[in-house]
Curated annotation (Swiss-Prot):
GO terms for biological process: base-excision repair. Its EC number is 3.2.2.-. DNA glycosylase with broad substrate specificity. It comes from Mycobacterium leprae (strain TN). [4Fe-4S] cluster binds at C19, C22, C123, C138. It comes from the Bacteria. The lineage of its organism: Bacteria, Bacillati, Actinomycetota, Actinomycetes, Mycobacteriales. One of its GO terms (molecular function) is DNA-deoxyinosine glycosylase activity. The gene is udgB. This is Type-5 uracil-DNA glycosylase. CDD domains: UDG-F5_TTUDGB_like.
Length: 229
């Protein structure tokens, strides 16, 4: 098994960080880490798979897609160092779910308030588009993480339709009904756990107004309440 039967979050994070299972993703993440974007030319790049971040006993789990090439692939922390992350962490801060309004790097002092942020694909994919084979290969990592945190989770926010479908396939997850993904939709899962749909805070979604800060605030206000935080 790819996840190696990790017994704790730190052990799982260590295993994730050295995975080389997908040749295309390995080549891309490492090429980006060497070539770099001009704005970050003087900064070291993580250039490895990105583990989940946040509480090891989260009441709220946030599921994205994959690291950004010059965001999490650079900083080593989910949604950190790119515009999507700027929008996400600002909203989380307004909701009282993190202690800082922006996430700059892994040493910036950011702390989670009973939340965890993760993704079904751990390496930055070319064009932000992992192949089906890649996310299937990567899926044991999320499944292992889910086994370690699921007993604490009371609410899940899926950032985008892909994350929505992935959550519904997690071990032990079943919905009383499975509505199609849309922004603001809520699915009742097992034992009172709720799954909330949210448009991904991508640069395109934010710039076009498909997703606004107010819409993010509504989602995380509701998620916080459902999670009992």
């Amino acid at each position: 098994m790819l996840s190696g039967g990790a017994g704790s979050i730190p052990e799982l994070n260590a295993q994730i960080s050295v995975c080389r299972a997908c040749p295309r993703l390995v080549d891309w993440r490492e090429e980006v880490a060497v070539v770099k974007r001009r704005a970050f030319a003087d900064q070291p790049y993580w250039g490895r798979p990105v583990p989940g971040w946040g509480s090891e006993q989260p009441r709220l789990l946030i599921v994205g897609l994959a690291p950004a090439a010059h965001g999490a692939n650079r900083t080593g922390r989910m949604f950190t160092g790119d515009r999507s992350g700027d929008q996400l962490y600002a909203a989380l801060h307004r909701a009282g779910l993190v202690n800082l309004p922006i996430s700059m790097d892994a040493a910036d002092g950011l702390q989670a308030n009973q939340i965890r942020i993760t993704a079904p694909v751990r390496c930055a994919p070319p064009g932000n588009a992992p192949t089906q084979a890649e996310w299937v290969t990567c899926s044991p990592w999320l499944e292992a993480e889910w086994r370690l945190v699921s007993e604490y989770v009371r609410a899940i926010v899926a950032l985008g339709g892909f994350a929505w479908q992935i959550v519904l396939r997690l071990p032990g997850v079943s919905a009383m009904r499975k509505p199609r993904f849309s922004h603001g939709v809520v699915a009742q899962l097992y034992a009172g756990v709720r799954l909330l749909g949210c448009y991904h805070p991508s640069q395109q979604n934010m710039f076009t107004g498909r997703l606004t800060p107010a819409m993010l605030d509504d989602i995380f206000r509701d998620a916080k309440k459902l999670a009992g935080i």
